[in-house]
Amino acid sequence: MKSLLFTLAVFMLLAQLVSGNWYVKKCLNDVGICKKKCKPEEMHVKNGWAMCGKQRDCCVPADRRANYPVFCVQTKTTRISTVTATTATTTLMMTTASMSSMAPTPVSPTG
């Protein structure tokens, strides 16, 4: 019985000390991750502090960038992210242009 209580106590203490991805705070509908500093290949999101707090940034990993709209993502000023920002702006312009071409056109009732 004593060994059972000792084992339970050890597991309860270890559960408090585990530093893994068990309690990672997510942002942007579980697309981004709250971190102190984003990696160069990750995208930094505008107003991420509202979801992650003032001391952390909301970072969108490179493999999940397609799941989040381009116009809400802002990059930090590094050489790699400047190219990404230019690509994102171009993609946004193309998306806006294609959406404006999808506007409904009036049809005359006679024909």
UniProtKB/Swiss-Prot annotation:
PTM annotation: O-glycosylated; glycans contain alpha(2,3)-linked sialic acids.
UniProt KW Endoplasmic reticulum keyword: no
In vitro binds to LPS, mediates antimicrobial activity and inhibits LPS-mediated inflammation: annotated span: 21-63
Primary subcellular site in the record, as a coarse category: secreted
Keywords: Antibiotic, Antimicrobial, Cleavage on pair of basic residues, Defensin, Disulfide bond, Fertilization, Secreted, Signal
UniProt cross-references to InterPro entries, sorted A to Z: Beta-defensin
GO CC annotation, single: extracellular region
One GO term of the biological process aspect: defense response to Gram-negative bacterium
Subunit structure, interactors included: Homodimer or homooligomer; disulfide-linked.
Protein's job: Highly glycosylated atypical beta-defensin involved in several aspects of sperm function. Facilitates sperm transport in the female reproductive tract and contributes to sperm protection against immunodetection; both functions are probably implicating the negative surface charge provided by its O-linked oligosaccharides in the sperm glycocalyx. Involved in binding of sperm to oviductal epithelial cells to form a sperm reservoir until ovulation.
Associated clinical condition: May be involved in infertility. Homozygosity for frameshift truncating mutations are associated with reduced sperm O-linked glycan content, impaired sperm mobility and a reduced live birth rate. However, for one common mutation the change in sperm sialic acid levels has been challenged.
Name of the molecule in the record: Beta-defensin 126
Phylogenetic classification of the source organism: Eukaryota, Metazoa, Chordata, Craniata, Vertebrata
